[in-house]
């Protein structure tokens, strides 16, 4: 249980720091941090916990919640639309679609599936490691 709480608090800190940084970070760097750091924290601590399915469930729920709050926070910032326009000009050579419309269900669904798939793979890896020992 302590690793679950540690994971939730560490991920809250990651999203808290990102929220504090706000729009003062490159959008690709922010996207990479959002996609990589929370799953790294959860993955590393997953191998230390004994409550596998509960750990996966609560990590997905809370990380999705943190992600949602982070995005809603960014969209309420007064400079958000100008930030998106500037970033799109900077990324004109890369085919990335960034919209300034409301944050929606498809983003949460993608992030949930992303987390779920990685944690399921880690779950089966952990089971294989336990059986070999």
Curated annotation (Swiss-Prot):
Spans through the membrane: 3-23, 27-47, 55-75, 103-123
Function: Accessory element involved in the expression of sarA and several virulence factors. Modulates SarA production and/or function in a strain-dependent manner. Affects the transcription of the accessory gene regulator (agr) and genes encoding virulence factors including alpha toxin (hla) and protein A (spa).
Subcellular compartments: Cell membrane
Record's bilayer topology term: Multi-pass membrane protein
Protein name, entry field: Protein msa
Keywords: Cell membrane, Membrane, Transmembrane, Transmembrane helix
Record carries keyword Nucleus: no
Gene Ontology cellular component terms for the protein in this record: plasma membrane
Source organism superkingdom: Bacteria
Keyword Cell membrane: yes
